[in-house]
A protein has these predicted regions:
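FNR/FR-type flavoprotein reductase catalytic core
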Residues: 77-139
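Ferredoxin-reductase
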Residues: 2-89
Length: 139
């Protein structure tokens, strides 16, 4: 099992996309390069906060530009704190966690062997839809 690491992320954008639903994009090149579809990361509140880290599904990961995108509902003190972050703010983010989805792999990658032509149906509801974007991109 890979060792969990904590990285420094920089908020690129953080916007409300629906009532009480936020989309935060972080520049965190090391974490973005490690992310796989279906994983999550712990986001850590400010150092002086008494709030515990929040596990949030990775909605998108772009290893080329070094960004991770998270979509989350503002439901308590922790996510309310995150909703107040602005571009340029620092956020501590864990390395991607969880097994993730088993997807057919591109040639040479270590995952499920490539299956050739494949049709897939992705099903998610509510917050469960967030990791489907990165899975769809991978397929």
């Amino acid at each position: 099992m890979p060792e969990k690491k904590i990285y420094k992320g920089i908020v690129v954008s953080n916007q409300e996309i629906a009532d009480g639903i936020m989309k935060m994009k972080l520049s965190a090149p090391e974490a973005a390069g490690e992310a796989r579809p279906g994983q999550f990361a712990n986001l850590y509140p400010a150092a002086d906060s008494l709030i515990l880290p929040r596990p949030i599904s990775i909605c998108d990961a772009d290893g080329d530009d070094g960004t991770l995108t998270f979509v989350y509902a503002v439901v308590g003190a922790g996510t309310a704190e995150f909703a107040g972050y602005e571009s340029g703010d620092t956020v501590r983010v864990s390395s991607p966690l969880g097994t993730g989805f088993l997807l057919p792999s591109p040639a040479g990658a270590e995952s499920v062997p490539a299956l050739g032509s494949l049709n897939a149906v992705l099903i998610g509801g509510g917050g469960g839809c967030a990791p489907m974007l990165v899975a769809a991109k991978e397929l």
